[in-house]
Swiss-Prot record:
One Pfam family of this chain: ILV_EDD_C
Cofactor (UniProt): [2Fe-2S] cluster; Mg(2+)
Function, in words: Functions in the biosynthesis of branched-chain amino acids. Catalyzes the dehydration of (2R,3R)-2,3-dihydroxy-3-methylpentanoate (2,3-dihydroxy-3-methylvalerate) into 2-oxo-3-methylpentanoate (2-oxo-3-methylvalerate) and of (2R)-2,3-dihydroxy-3-methylbutanoate (2,3-dihydroxyisovalerate) into 2-oxo-3-methylbutanoate (2-oxoisovalerate), the penultimate precursor to L-isoleucine and L-valine, respectively.
Keyword Protease: no
Active site: S468 (proton acceptor)
The protein's name in its UniProt record: Dihydroxy-acid dehydratase
Lineage: Bacteria, Bacillati, Bacillota, Clostridia, Thermoanaerobacterales
Reactions that this protein is recorded to catalyse: (2R)-2,3-dihydroxy-3-methylbutanoate = 3-methyl-2-oxobutanoate + H2O; (2R,3R)-2,3-dihydroxy-3-methylpentanoate = (S)-3-methyl-2-oxopentanoate + H2O
């Protein structure tokens, strides 16, 4: 075992002395050392309770004969980081998390790992680390926040963001917005809709890297602590059987994850993160695969922001096992694959039941015959762009309109909130990609403003940046190549017609090739916005969104 490198033999007496300074006994030195990697902090609602979850994990590890050690990593709250320079650091933190886990694990030679993430970039950051290190590992998240209630209606953070736009449009009073502010987020956990954090926690379960229940058991339920204890016990079984992440995360389990992604209508960020995890694991992935899976996978759920349901509703309906059970009825799930439970997918699904067909539509009565996400290609996005089509109103699935061009999120948001955007417009926000931002910010504030003002049925928004999982409407992101790399989005001018055809998977700039070539010859890329610190280094290393915005090997 790796830990023998720090505790066995005469030459390791100094190492053992330091371990004994921690209170480790001679008996414990004979046992496996288990790293419990978590992202507790007091500034992130999704993480503020993780110490309690971690204590349960450690209890499970000890029960099964291991010695647990906590390893904290950073974690950004995307909601608090939204719409200012802090959002530039969100996606960039994913690579920092993966690298820091690698450093701690290699330096201290753990035998196996339990990962305890919860929010947006922490989950994929830890998944990347798990694939890179390939030590026996299991995930158990902190769990979703319960929905809030305002005037008898279930609500979440997305309602507060949209409320800002509603106030600007005169559709809501400031007093009513304050009510949403006070009650939309009732306590700890990842925000209550099918936003990025919950999407990734559900997909971690779907690909077999977490036990059933990981994605949906509410943060405040004792069942979450029981799951954490069981995960601590299970990692010892994985260690004894030498089952490693790359044994579980294969191309076939990736396809299972994508199928669940389409059925749930997950965040567009899942495409970025699954691509990154697959790259680290050596599993083939390209954007065409997303469309292939989407074409054959029905959309069964419409959770917030696409519909009225929240994560607790999905939990009570049977959770991810119930969704996978529905998909398996049409052969859309590979059931013979290994999971961290020690059982196959099929064995995990044996007793799964869809307890609420209003929350999880039966496979023969889906919301749509195709999945919740689509990849668009065309003259504006030669290497692809992504849209959460399950959150797009029917009248905006196809749309042609004049471009309103902005070189930053702030400029676009100001224009929207001051009434400068009209029905039919296509808002274009560029130079917000992985390199151009740098950091590929989420455009939740402008999309929420449009939705809150009632313009989501008339206005589209296109960007080389990203969107929050809380975004709804005709919001098309990850446009590749990005503007900073001279992609066509950098050539768009005010008033150019843009054609969106989501069913046809097309995104086109209706400008002649001759004109575009002339514009490209005169194009001047803006100077880097940040020239020092971590983001300056990140900008030099990060790849395009269609590759997962990874650091290429």
């Amino acid at each position: 075992m790796p830990s023998h490198l720090i505790k066995s033999g005469i030459s390791k007496a100094p190492h053992r002395s330091l371990l004994k300074a921690l209170g480790i006994t001679d008996n414990e030195l004979k046992r496996p050392f288990i790293g419990v990697v978590h992202s507790f902090s007091e500034i992130v609602p999704g993480h503020v309770h993780l110490r309690t979850v971690v204590e349960a994990v450690k209890a499970g590890v000890r029960t099964a004969g291991g010695v647990p050690f906590e390893l904290p990593v950073i974690g950004v709250c995307d909601g608090i980081a939204m719409n200012h320079e802090g959002m530039k650091y969100s996606l960039a933190s994913r690579e920092l998390i993966a690298d820091s886990v690698e450093v701690m694990v290699k330096a201290h030679q753990f035998d196996a790992l339990v990962f305890v993430p919860n929010c947006d970039k922490i989950v994929p950051g830890m998944l990347i680390a798990a694939m890179r290190l390939n030590l026996p590992a299991i995930f158990v998240s902190g769990g979703p926040m319960l929905a809030g209630r305002v005037r008898g209606k279930s609500v979440s953070l997305s309602n507060v963001f949209e409320g800002v736009g509603a106030v600007a449009a005169g559709l809501m009073s400031e007093e009513e917005l304050l009510e949403y502010e006070n009650y939309a987020c009732p306590g700890c956990g990842s925000c209550a809709g099918m936003f990025t954090a919950n999407s990734m926690n559900c997909l971690t379960e779907a690909i077999g890297m977490a036990l059933p229940g990981n994605g949906t058991i509410p943060a405040v339920y004792a069942e979450r602590l029981r799951l954490a204890k069981l995960s601590g016990e299970k990692v010892m079984e994985l260690l004894s059987q030498n089952i490693r992440p790359r044994d579980i995360f294969t191309r076939e389990s990736l396809l299972n994850g994508l199928a669940v992604d389409m059925a749930l209508g997950c965040s567009t960020n899942t495409v970025l993160h699954l691509a990154a995890v697959a790259y680290e694991a050596g599993v083939e992935f390209d954007l065409n695969l997303v469309n292939e899976v989407s074409e054959r996978t029905p959309n069964l759920c419409r959770l917030s922001p696409a519909g009225p349901h929240h994560m607790e509703d999905l939990y009570f309906a049977g959770g991810i096992p119930a969704v996978m059970k529905e998909l398996s009825k049409k052969g859309l799930i590979r059931e013979d694959l290994l999971t961290v439970s020690g059982k196959t997918v099929g064995e995990n699904l044996k007793n799964a039941v869809n307890k609420n067909p209003e929350v999880i539509r039966p496979i023969d009565n889906p919301y749509s015959e195709t999945g919740g996400l689509a990849i668009l290609f065309g003259t504006l996005a030669p290497r692809g762009a992504v849209v959460k089509k399950s959150a797009v109103l029917p009248e905006m699935l196809t749309h042609t309109g004049p471009a309103r061009v902005f070189d930053s999120e702030e400029d676009a948001t100001t224009a929207i909130l001051t009434g400068q955007i009209k029905k039919g417009d296509v808002v274009v926000i560029r130079y917000e990609g992985p390199k151009g931002g740098p950091g590929m910010r989420e455009m939740l504030t402008p999309t929420s403003a449009l939705a809150g003002m009632g313009l989501d049925k008339d206005v589209a928004l296109i960007t080389d940046g990203r969107f929050s999982g809380a975004t709804r409407g005709a919001a098309i992101g990850h446009v590749s190549p990005e503007g900073y790399e001279g992609g066509p989005i950098a050539l768009v001018r005010e008033g150019d017609l843009i054609k969106i055809d989501i069913p046809g998977q097309r995104l086109d700039l209706l400008v002649s090739e001759e004109e575009l070539n002339q514009r490209k010859a005169r194009l001047q890329i803006p100077e880097p916005k940040i020239k020092e610190g971590y983001l300056a280094r990140y900008q030099k290393l990060v790849s395009s969104a269609n590759l997962g915005a990874v650091f290429l090997k």
